[in-house]
Amino acid sequence: FAENMSKVPVVGQLAQVLTFRSFEGTEGDVELNVNVPVVKGPDGKELPAKVNARIQQLTADYEAQAEKEMAEYKESFFQTGGTKEEWADRTMDLYIDYDVKYLSNDVLSLGVTTAKSWVSADEEHTYYNIDLKNDKELTLQDVLGDDYAAICNKSIVSQIEERMAADANASFF
C-alpha cells in the first residue's frame, strides 16, 4: 500500500515531516548514523504529537539497548581473556532513519528504520499511518474494508507468483 501511495504526486500538504535530530559520529564503541523525524501536523490535531512521542521513545529505547548490549559484550570480551588491542577492532554500527512513504492533506504514511550491526545484525521497520483529517491511525481495514485480510493475501500471493516467474531462484519467508 505505502509503496504504491508513494508514487502519487503531492502539492501543498497541511502536515510536514522534518528531521528532529540528526547525528553522525562515534559515542564510545558505537558508530552512529541517526536521523529522527518529527511530524508537524495540522493545528488542533492530537495524533501527530502522540506519534512523535512514540517515535522519540522508540529511537531512545533502541539507542539505549544498543549501548547496553555493547557494554555487556565488552565486559564479557575482557572477562574471557580479550585484550585491548583485539577490542580496538570492534564497534557497533547503529542506524536510525525515516522515509515518508506518502503525504497528502489527508494521509501521512511514515516509516522509521532502526538497525544495528556488530557480532550479528538486526533491522526493524516501524510504520505510522495517520488519517490527518480525522486525527486517527489508519489500519488496513480502514483503507481496504472488512475483507482486508483476503485482499492482502491475494495481493501477496500474486506478487510472489510474479517474482517467481521472473526469477526461479527467488525465495520467500
Q: Which residues does each predicted region cover?
A:
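Compositionally biased intrinsically disordered regions enriched in Thr/Gly
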Residues: 2-173
